[in-house]
């Protein structure tokens, strides 16, 4: 899809845009709920705040970091990954190294190359575009980049595998009566782990990412019941429509041209 977006003539032809975090407007929209969460706290509890953010493509947590740069006094951020833990390994070791994607029960975090991390690097490297280009080109060529002095800028990280996710969903449900989806469970994991408590003072705010009804099998396995949502229940009675498209830029563009012309 990045190749498709880079074809500016095609993008202009069909009015192509994106609603995922490739589009900076998405990141800016996500800034809002960090500010909202901050002001929902009592005034005397707004110091030493750490946001715990389930993270795959680094977009959500980047929004929070930008809010911090805007002046909201957020202490830091914990990047909560699943078993696809390239960002956890980065913040632990300073090494950004590609591995095979391991499919998980938290599929939106099944990412090895976090595209929004480039945006963070740009600021971390004092807006040195040439340095960012060198880092990204080295990573693309070798699958690895070693940061000599990575400024973690208040970031820490954690990793949660599939077995732990199911356990955390159950623990959160029993303790709080809240049904967490698999991605949100990765955010709860470090908060519920007593060994992490010595690292934090103040408040930890866990960001939820999806409705648990999207993951019925995982939720049922963890707590013995399904979570439902009316908008998803309505879809069950509708006919399934699906298309198969070759995973090439030209095939995707041809598919888009055909279907955009029908709108």
Task: Label each residue range with its predicted role.
Residues 1-263:
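PLP-dependent amino-acid enzyme catalytic core
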């Amino acid at each position: 899809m990045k190749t498709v977006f880079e074809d500016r003539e095609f993008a202009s032809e069909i009015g192509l845009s994106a609603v995922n975090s490739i589009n900076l407007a998405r990141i800016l929209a996500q800034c809002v709920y960090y500010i909202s969460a901050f002001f929902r706290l009592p005034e005397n509890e707004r110091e030493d705040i750490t946001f715990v953010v389930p993270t795959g493509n680094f977009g959500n947590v980047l929004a929070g970091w930008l809010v911090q740069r805007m002046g909201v006094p957020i202490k830091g951020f914990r990047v909560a990954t699943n078993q696809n833990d390239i960002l956890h390994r980065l913040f632990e070791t300073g090494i950004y190294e590609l591995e095979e994607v391991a499919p998980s029960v938290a599929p939106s975090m099944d990412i090895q190359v976090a595209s929004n991390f480039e945006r963070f690097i740009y600021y971390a490297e004092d807006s040195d575009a040439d340095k960012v280009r060198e880092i990204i080109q080295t990573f693309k060529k070798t699958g690895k980049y070693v940061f000599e002095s990575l400024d973690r800028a208040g970031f820490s990280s954690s990793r949660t595998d599939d077995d732990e996710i199911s356990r955390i969903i159950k623990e959160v449900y029993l303790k709080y009566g809240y049904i967490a989806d698999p991605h949100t469970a990765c955010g709860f994991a470090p908060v519920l782990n007593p060994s992490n408590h010595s690292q934090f003072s103040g408040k930890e705010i866990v960001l939820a990412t999806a409705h648990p009804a999207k993951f019925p099998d995982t939720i049922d396995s963890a707590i013995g019941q399904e979570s439902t949502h009316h908008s998803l229940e309505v879809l069950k009675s509708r006919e399934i429509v699906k298309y198969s498209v070759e995973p090439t830029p030209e095939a995707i563009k041809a598919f888009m041209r055909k279907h955009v012309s029908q709108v």
